[in-house]
C-alpha cells in the first residue's frame, strides 16, 4: 500500500493541474466572447505591413521638404506651404479615387471573379490619368490662388516653384495608389513594405544629391519626390505584371477596362469626396487659428494637434484597410455574417489601438510637444488641450475603421453626405463659435472638431448597424 505522505502530493498536483487548465479554459472562453481571437490575429497581422507601407510612402514628400527647409526660412515656408497644398488639392484626391477598388476588387476577389480585378485596376488608372492632368493644370495657377488667399507674395512664389517640379509625380502617385488597392484586396501585403521602403531610401539619397551635390538647390527637393514616386510606381507595377501571385488577377492590358469607367466613377468620386472633405476640415482649422488673436501661438497649437492626429491615423489606416478587405471579400463571397463579424472585431481593435495611443499621449505629452516647440507657453497650452486631443483621436480611430467598412460595402456616396453634414454643418460652425465668440481660441476649434467627428462616428455606426448588407451589383452602381 502506498504511503499517504508520498501519494497525496501527486493527487494534489493532478487536481491543481485540472484547476489550472479549467481556469485557462474559462479565461479563453471569456476572451472569445468579447472578441474573435483568430479574426483579431488575422487583422493585426494584415495591419502592420499596411501601416509601414503607408508611413514609408508618406515620408517621401516629407523628407524632400526637410532638405529644402535647410536652405533658409523662405525655402522652409515655401516648401511647407507647397506640400500642404499638394496634399489637400492633389495627393488626397488620388488616394480617394483609388477607394473604388476597395469595393470593386475586394468583392470581385471574394466572388472569385479574378480576371475582373485587373480590368477594374486599368479602369481606375484611366480615371486617375484624367484627373491628374486636370489637377496639374490647376497647380500651375498656384501663385495666383495663394495671392487670392492673401498669402505672402515671396512665400507664394517659392511654393508655386516647388509645386511646378512636384507635379510630374502626381500621376505616378495616382497609379501607385491604385496598384496598392489591387494588392491590398488580395491580401498580398508583405511585399508592399519593401516596395515602399526602397523608394524612400532612394528619395533621401536623390534629394541630397540634387539639392547639395548637383547644385539644384530648392528645386532639387521636389524633383527628387517626382523621381522617387515614379520609381515606386514602376517597380511595384513591374512586380504585379511579372509575379506568379497575380497570374489570375492580372492577365494583361484590355480594352474592356473602358467599359467600366462610368461604374468606377460612381464609386471613385464619392470616395475622393469622403477623403477630401475630412482633409479640408483640418486645414480649415489651421486657417482659422491663423486669423485669431495671437496667431503664432494658436496656429502652432492647432498645427501640432493636426500633426498628432495625422500620425495617429497612420496606425488606424492599417486596421481600416484590413476592415475594408475582410468585409469586401466576405460580401463578394456572399457571406454577410462573416463580414459583420470582421467589422465587429475591427471596431474593437480600433478602440484598443486608440487607448494605447491616448495613454502614450497623456503620459508623454511634454516630451511630444517638445519635438515641435521649446516655448513654455505652447507646452502649457498643449497640456490643457491633451484631453480634447485624446477624445478626437479615439473617435477618429473608430470612424477610420467604419469608413473602411463602408468602402468595402460600396457605401461611399452615403458616407460623403455624412462627412459633409457632420464636418461642415456641425463641426466647423461649432468650432468658429467656440473659438471666436466664446474666446476659447485653439481649444474652441478643437471642441468643434470633436463634435463633428462624434457625429460622424455615430452616423457611420448607425449606418453600419441598420443598413442592409448586400453584395454589390456592378451593373446597378
UniProtKB/Swiss-Prot annotation:
The keyword Transmembrane helix applies. Expressed in the root epidermis and cortex. Not expressed in hypocotyl. Detected in the elongation zone of young roots, but not in the meristematic region. The chain crosses the membrane at residues 48-68, 76-96, 129-149, 161-180, 188-208, 213-233, 260-282, 301-321, 352-372, 382-402, 414-434, 446-466. Residues 1-27 are annotated as: Disordered. Disruption phenotype: Aberrant lateral root formation due to hypersensitivity to toxic compounds. Keywords: Membrane, Transmembrane, Transmembrane helix, Transport. The keyword DNA-binding does not apply. Residues 11-22 have a biased composition (Basic and acidic residues). CDD domains: MATE_eukaryotic. Required for protection of the roots from inhibitory compounds. When expressed in a heterologous system, confers resistance to tetramethylammonium chloride. This is Protein DETOXIFICATION 19. It comes from Arabidopsis thaliana (Mouse-ear cress).
